[in-house]
Amino acid sequence: MIKKILISQPQPTSEKSPYYDIEKAYGVEFIFRPFFKVEGLNAKEFRNQKINILDYTAVVFTSRHAIDNFFKLAKEMRITIPEDMKYFCVIETIALYIQKYVQYRKRKVFFGTTGKIADLVPLMAKHKEEKYLVPMSEGHNEDVTKLLDAKKLKHQECIMYRTVDNDFNEEEKKAFDYDMVVFFSPMGVKALYKNFPNFKQDNIKIGTFGQGTAKAAQDEGLVLSLQAPTPKYPSMTSAMNAFLRDQEED
């Protein structure tokens, strides 16, 4: 019987999150506990890259972390972002998040439909005159650079944040009694084994989001009970709802 589920992500900020509906429907408890956290660079670290934000006419956002840290650094460095700055986002949900910092205007905000940078590039190519700044995480690969170079776009990648471990303390390690653990990135899988080098799956169910995460879990010998996204279940919550429903029927 699955009752206690570890979700390796931050707790949802909205009270209307589907996770809470699932808890009520199936009598389960979700524990939200990220295995790593995102830390923004400070102004001094960013200045070391010798990049002037105001030299650019458009910003490309691949995540909410990128948005948060872009505007945090701008504020820290007392930079006023021009009204006519354009924003290109990999998907609409990220584009809408910009409203937290600036007024949302359709002529300034553009977004893709799949969440993949490769599918945003053709839209960016329609605005060849723009100079694109792309906030990234420390340790990023060169995929974005290659995609933008291929379209001959004027662009500059920059590091604005990094991922750091969010290790379990001794008390958390002793209290690790979950019936199911859900991972959202390969880093989460690595973090589990860093905190629990002798981890044995036994009867614990494992869920993963994304192909890379599933592969990382399987490479560690974990047996997966739940994988998302799928055409039928595009989100983890929709997949989780179906999974728990099936468990009840068995």
What is the meaning of each model-derived region?
Residues 1-250:
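Conserved beta-alpha
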